[in-house]
A protein has these predicted regions:
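Acidic/polar, glycine-anchored loop/turn motif associated with catalytic or activation segments
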Residues: 1-91, 98-150
Length: 150
C-alpha cells in the first residue's frame, strides 16, 4: 500500500522552492529542507506539513519520524556519492509504502525524480534537462550513467 505522499529533500534552491520563496535558483541551502506533497492530481499535489499529513491520516507520527530519518540518511549517503562524481544533488524525491506493517521506500532514484547538476558548470543533468525534450532525456540519462559507472 503506497502512502499518498511525495517526500522531497532539497539541498539547493531550485524548482518550486525557489519560485515559492523568491530564492535565487542555485543557492546552496544552509541545511536541507524536507517537504511533503499530497499526491492528488485533483488538488494539484499541494505542499503539506506534518500536521496536515497526520490530520489526513496519511501517516502516523512514528511513520513520519521514520520517513524523515530515512530521507535524511539517504541524503547523507547520496551527497558524497555524487560529489565524488562531480555531480551536485540539488534535490530528490522519495515515496514510501507499507507492506505487512513495515514502512518501505516504494520508489527509485532516477534522473526523473532527482535534480542533478554538474558540480563545476551547474548544467542540468537530471529532470530539468530531461523535461525540455525527449531527445535530451536519453543524453541526460547517459551522462549520469557515465559518471556513476566509470
Amino acid at each position: 500500500e503506497m502512502i499518498r505522499l511525495e517526500v522531497v529533500l532539497r539541498n539547493i534552491a531550485a524548482g518550486s522552492l525557489a519560485k515559492r520563496l523568491g530564492m535565487e535558483v542555485g543557492t546552496t541551502l544552509p541545511a536541507p529542507i524536507l517537504e511533503f506533497y499530497y499526491k492528488s492530481d485533483a488538488l494539484g499535489d499541494p505542499l503539506l506539513n506534518e500536521y496536515h499529513v497526520r490530520a489526513l491520516g496519511l501517516a502516523s507520527s512514528e511513520e513520519l519520524r521514520a520517513i524523515r530519518e530515512t530521507t535524511f540518511r539517504a541524503n547523507g549517503v547520496l551527497l558524497p556519492f555524487f560529489a565524488e562524481r562531480e555531480i551536485l544533488l540539488a534535490d530528490f524525491k522519495l515515496e514510501f509504502g507499507r507492506q505487512k506493517g513495515a514502512l518501505l521506500v516504494g520508489d527509485e532514484l532516477t534522473p526523473d525524480g532527482c535534480r542533478f547538476w554538474d558540480r563545476t558548470t551547474r548544467e542540468n543533468l537530471g529532470k530539468d534537462r530531461a523535461r525540455r525534450s525527449l531527445a535530451r532525456e536519453a543524453t541526460a540519462y547517459q551522462e549520469i550513467f557515465r559518471r556513476v559507472c566509470t
